[in-house]
Amino acid sequence: MRVMVDQDLCGTSGQCVLTLPGTFRQREPDGVAEVCVATVPHALHAAVRLAASQCPVAAIRVIESDAGDGERASADPAPSPAEAERHAAKDQHNLG
């Protein structure tokens, strides 16, 4: 999985950074979000989907990698926030 931020669309709310500070950061001085990783570790996939679903301006694009299907964008449909939170909590628990 890869993740991208449309920096022209980013509203600088920082929600993605609050959700996953190791994956997203806000650049100085304008606060636009940037991605910190080239490839998202499997353990953080659900949390990245959650961050994308919570972006108030839908500036985060998740690119799923599937060996049989190449890469496909999956900004829609996003999981419900409750479903994504359950998966993110499970992933975070598995990291510890």
From Swiss-Prot:
Binds 1 [3Fe-4S] cluster. It comes from the Bacteria. It holds the Pfam family Fer4_15. The keyword Transport applies. Keywords: 3Fe-4S, Electron transport, Iron, Iron-sulfur, Metal-binding, Transport. Disulfide bonds: none annotated. Residues 83-96 have a biased composition (Basic and acidic residues). Gene3D superfamilies: 3.30.70.20. Its cofactor is [3Fe-4S] cluster. [3Fe-4S] cluster binds at residues 10, 16, 55. Residues 67-96 are annotated as: Disordered. GO terms for molecular function: 3 iron, 4 sulfur cluster binding; electron transfer activity; iron ion binding. The keyword Aminoacyl-tRNA synthetase does not apply. Electron transport protein for the cytochrome systems. This is Uncharacterized P450-system 3Fe-4S ferredoxin blr2145.1. It comes from Bradyrhizobium diazoefficiens (strain JCM 10833 / BCRC 13528 / IAM 13628 / NBRC 14792 / USDA 110).
